[in-house]
Amino acid sequence: ALSGGTYANLRTQVHKVEREYRPETRPLGEDTLADALDIIRRWEHGHCRFDDCGLRDDRVDEEALLLRRELEVTGIVLYLDGRPTAVSAGFFLAPGLFDLAVAKSVSTAQGVSYYAKRELFRRLDCAAVNLEEDLGIPGLRQMKNRLCPAAKNEIWEARPLWNG
């Protein structure tokens, strides 16, 4: 439960989704895979690329879902008013520790990404969730900070001191 003042903003956004839409959450499976892949493919990439090598975050997500059995990926697809809107999925790194590897939404409605994550997390038996790196993207970093993390790891980047 998101109790206490720390989570007031998250509760407000989640309740807004519940008030303004008919949300339905379905487990990621054979019957929802096509919808999940469609969400990932329709997701706006913006500048979410890894440096200059042309790798795209959505391709990683797509592969994770296509290999969900081998990777033991579990997840949900969120439908708003009957339309596939968001997908959240990941896998356990250890007992009680879940890694959220896939989190995409095709809606600009406030609170949808929080709602989808909450719906996945409430189905899991875990004490902690790893949200992975934010790639230096300000909007993603802000969203993750609003989830009130218990801890953050410092990210380091190695660069050569010479050319050649």
Feature map (PLM): residue ranges:
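Short, hydrophobic/aromatic alpha-helical segments in well-folded domains
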Residues: 13, 39, 61-64, 116-120, ...
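Short, conserved active-site entrance elements at the starts or edges of catalytic domains
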Residues: 31, 35-84
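Aromatic (often tryptophan-rich) hydrophobic motifs at membrane interfaces
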Residues: 72-163
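Short, contiguous, pocket-lining structural segments
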Residues: 5, 9, 28-32, 70, ...
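Acyltransferase donor/substrate-recognition loop-hinge adjacent to the catalytic core
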Residues: 1-51
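Glycine-rich loops and low-complexity Gly/Arg-rich segments
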Residues: 15-19, 49-53, 124-126, 153-158
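A short linear-motif detector with a strong N-terminal bias
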Residues: 2-6, 54-57, 109-110, 136-137
